UniProtKB/Swiss-Prot annotation:
One of its GO terms (cellular component) is cytosol. SUPFAM superfamilies: Nucleic acid-binding proteins (SSF50249). Residues 1-73 form the S1-like domain. Signal peptide: none annotated. One of the essential components for the initiation of protein synthesis. Stabilizes the binding of IF-2 and IF-3 on the 30S subunit to which N-formylmethionyl-tRNA(fMet) subsequently binds. Helps modulate mRNA selection, yielding the 30S pre-initiation complex (PIC). Upon addition of the 50S ribosomal subunit IF-1, IF-2 and IF-3 are released leaving the mature 70S translation initiation complex. Its main location: cytoplasm. The keyword Lipid metabolism does not apply. This is Translation initiation factor IF-1. Gene3D superfamilies: Nucleic acid-binding proteins. It is found in: Cytoplasm. It comes from Mycolicibacterium smegmatis (strain ATCC 700084 / mc(2)155). Belongs to the IF-1 family. Component of the 30S ribosomal translation pre-initiation complex which assembles on the 30S ribosome in the order IF-2 and IF-3, IF-1 and N-formylmethionyl-tRNA(fMet); mRNA recruitment can occur at any time during PIC assembly. Keywords: Cytoplasm, Initiation factor, Protein biosynthesis, RNA-binding, rRNA-binding.
Length: 73
């Protein structure tokens, strides 16, 4: 997992899949964010299903959107 400078990593749970490889994620603190899959996860065909636990990278500039960087087994 490559960590970007200034990015905030949080754990969450996938609530629902949306079109265009987007997902609604509920974070541990109860907030809901919109997230897309990172490029490496797309390259390796890692599937993300509802109820999966994931790590989301949030930008400090927009905390309502993020990137899924890891899916727990």
């Amino acid at each position: 997992m490559a960590k970007k400078d200034g990015a905030i990593e949080v754990e969450g749970r996938v609530i629902e899949p949306l079109p265009n490889a987007m997902f609604r994620i509920e974070l541990e603190n109860g907030h809901k964010v919109l997230a897309h899959i990172s490029g490496k996860m797309r390259q390796h065909y890692i599937r993300i299903l509802p109820e999966d636990r994931v790590v989301v990278e949030l930008s400090p500039y927009d905390l309502s959107r993020g990137r899924i960087v890891y899916r727990y087994k």
